[in-house]
């Protein structure tokens, strides 16, 4: 599953926060917008008219051009990832700067930007040690801006939480400056939006986290948006054999386009590990769980050769567990590691991914299998739930 973290607040916490936010921002200037909202678990998403407050100190308002429809957004609507509702969805967005707050010098009106759901402070232990994707500031801004407030309000004036500190399934959004990356204006914004999560998460899992080596063997479980990018990350890194694993023939066919040398449909199969071990000629050097299920992580670990590395990429439900044999782990020298947001360094990695796309090496055009208007958002989520291959993108107006 595409990367995000959930946080469950008590009703008292939410009510207290809402009252504080309402008092603080009653007099703020706002921008009317339409946004895609989740109000109740398991219910269809709705398109609502909201108000987006103008940027405060250290913040930027963007006019969205496009937003990818990510499985993490779906997980927030069904409770797989726990988020306080109501919630403005979206964390995979690209757009144009519409206004800047006090003290903002990195961005100017008219700049093209991509959202990053990891808010990087640059000061904590993780940022200072070269692991900004683990920045503690992000943990304080899972459904708000880093200051604990929101800039989004519904028609009744009630505050709306924002998914992953972004909430970019909206015509306008106000984000903290640390949640944005400036990009080349020549880059198509609907393609750029994909880099914000699905591409960065999958590609980065292969290139940044696992550091796939040329000539190696890799197995990728799950060929959704993240899995396809893990496949092409392995391909660009020079893996000699890349096995794509899924239950959908359509997704497996698409995986070939992204660099898979072999495919394996697990539908009805019981001896998955043995079959993949044989297919890879004695096990894989790298295996990726891009679905987000404990049992699939176990399968990924099991298909490794001695000394191999399994990477869990998708975010599982909080109660899901991984069970491994401790003796087996010790004597095989295998490694199991997590990859959050593809171990991203957004300010460095986003421009590099764009350069790869513009040179023809990174496939983004092929990733988009359908675009939707904001009014078609419920259909976009239904298609995602049904397992439509590739990535759906919501396009706002005519600026993509």
Predicted regions and their residues:
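C-terminal hydrophobic helical "lid"/dimerization subdomain
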Residues: 24-31, 298-302, 347-400
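Glycine-rich beta-strand-centered segment in the early N-terminal region that forms part
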Residues: 53-67, 77-128, 133, 184-186
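NAD(P)H dinucleotide-binding glycine-rich loop of Rossmann-like/cofactor-binding domains
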Residues: 106, 123-221
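Adenosine-nucleotide cofactor-binding segment
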Residues: 217-223, 233-299
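N-terminal Rossmann-fold NAD(P) dinucleotide-binding loop
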Residues: 227-228
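C-terminal substrate-binding/catalytic core of Rossmann-like NAD(P)-dependent dehydrogenases/reductases
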Residues: 273, 277, 281, 318-370, ...
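Glycine-centered, small-residue-biased loops immediately flanking beta-strands
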Residues: 308-309, 334
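Acidic carboxylate diad motif detector
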Residues: 313-314
